[in-house]
A protein has these predicted regions:
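Active-site loop segments of alpha/beta catalytic cores
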Residues: 1-46, 113, 118, 122, ...
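Segments that shape or occlude catalytic/ligand-binding pockets
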Residues: 34-91
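Generic hydrophobic, aliphatic-rich segments that mediate packing or membrane embedding
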Residues: 53, 106-108, 169, 200
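Amphipathic repeat-derived elements
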Residues: 81-95, 280, 288-290
Length: 394
């Protein structure tokens, strides 16, 4: 008997063999491909966009995987992109933000005054095309142990109203989706990613050698400041957490990852999965050095195993061999060189081959490696889904 898409995903997450490999689309819920397909939707009308992700995924015949981020997580959303909580104020956390724009890039410069001292940060929003934005903390707020201590002592925690609000934001998406797929949420990143949003990455990548005390305190704070948000997201009715782990990529090497990063990342995964909700660990860069290391996370799934030559270094056949079913492999047809820039025939050929490699033994979900880009031919996306489903059966 054929499974529903929801049953299909859940079976794979439980380590069971479904009726066929789940075939899904990674569509970001603002800008990019969704803006291409629905240019008249307000890019800040998050619910409407998320409903359109469901609509187009259904139309194309995919098992729907809605990845909630935009509008779902305010005020944590801005901390997710980088920096401190400048949305909330208390008597001991006074925020002054100056906003400037050149018509394309908006820069928010914040000064945060506390009884113990002042912190500063800069956050940039770059509209790379109408309706598509890039976000980054371009001036990191933590430079010293003293700065770190100010954050630990004075940054406001999760607002009391937030758990109910995030439940209200998830509920209509869950209801609209039904059994046609799963609702995922971009939960707090792993602590190394969270740390990279507070301190300069050039310092972070060697800090476990140059200043191990600072590094340890930074990791502990990076876990502590998002714990309540993680629990609230988990209780909001989602089906899967997506946990960012791209900052500690394969270029750091297996030894550095296992000795200095893995134990902290595992704690965030344990928290996310504490009530039985599965998590997907997301590393969209170099990954082959860490494929076996990720077994130590205890995570249910890892994505997206971006293929070479442009996106990453993943060798899917080698990945399946190394993983051996210890976690679900989610990936990974090249969304740029194949789906965006290739012909329909290219898409069909690569998709069929990827399914042929990934399907045996189960523990596999097929999707475009990372989110679909603006300018992707819809006929290529249709060919990807159709070809994948044709070859997906067990």
């Amino acid at each position: 008997m054929a499974m529903t898409p929801r049953e299909r995903f859940q079976a794979v997450f439980r380590g069971e063999l479904p009726d066929r490999v789940p075939v899904t689309l990674f569509i970001q819920d603002q800008g990019h491909f969704i803006n291409q397909m629905y240019p008249d939707i307000d890019p800040w009308d998050y619910r409407a966009i998320q409903l359109k992700v469901i609509e187009i995924s259904r139309q194309l015949g995919a098992d729907v995987f809605v990845r909630l981020l935009f509008g779902t997580l305010d005020p944590f959303q801005w901390m997710f992109f980088g920096g401190l909580n400048v949305s909330e104020e208390t008597e001991t956390w006074e925020v002054h933000t100056d906003e400037t724009s050149d018509g394309r890039t908006t820069i928010r410069r914040s000064e945060i005054r506390t009884p113990g001292g002042t912190l500063t940060q800069e956050f940039s929003i770059d509209e790379i095309r109408p309706g598509t934005f890039m976000y980054a903390c371009t001036g990191k707020p933590v430079r010293t142990m003293a700065d770190l201590d100010l954050v630990r002592r004075y940054e406001p925690g999760m607002p009391a109203w937030w758990p109910a609000a995030v439940r209200e934001r998830v509920a209509p998406i869950r209801a609209a989706l039904g059994d046609d797929g799963i609702v995922g949420c971009w939960s707090p990143h792993g602590p190394f990613n969270m740390a990279s949003l507070l301190v300069d990455e050039q310092d972070l990548y060697c800090m476990f050698y140059t200043d191990p005390d600072f590094y340890r305190e930074l990791m502990e704070l990076s876990l502590a400041r998002v714990a309540a948000y993680t629990r609230a997201i988990d209780a909001a009715g989602i089906d899967v957490h997506i946990v960012g782990g791209n900052a500690p990529g394969g270029f750091l090497g297996r030894r550095n990852y296992e000795q200095h990063i893995l134990a902290y990342e595992r704690r965030q995964i344990q928290l996310a999965q504490a009530t039985g909700t599965p998590a997907i660990y997301h590393n969209c860069g170099q990954i082959m050095q860490l494929v076996e290391s990720y077994k130590g996370l205890g995570v249910v799934a890892v994505e997206p195993f971006s293929p070479p030559p442009q996106l990453g270094d993943a060798d899917l056949a080698k990945v399946k061999e190394l993983v051996g079913g210890d976690y679900v492999v989610v990936g990974g047809v090249d969304q740029v060189l194949v789906i965006q820039r290739g012909t329909v025939e290219d898409v069909q050929r690569v998709t069929a081959r990827t399914m042929e490699i990934g399907k045996p033994g189960g523990h596999f979900i097929l999707q475009n490696a990372d989110f679909l880009e603006y300018g992707t031919p819809p006929e290529n996306v249709e060919a990807f889904v159709r070809t994948a489903v044709e070859h997906a059966g067990y």
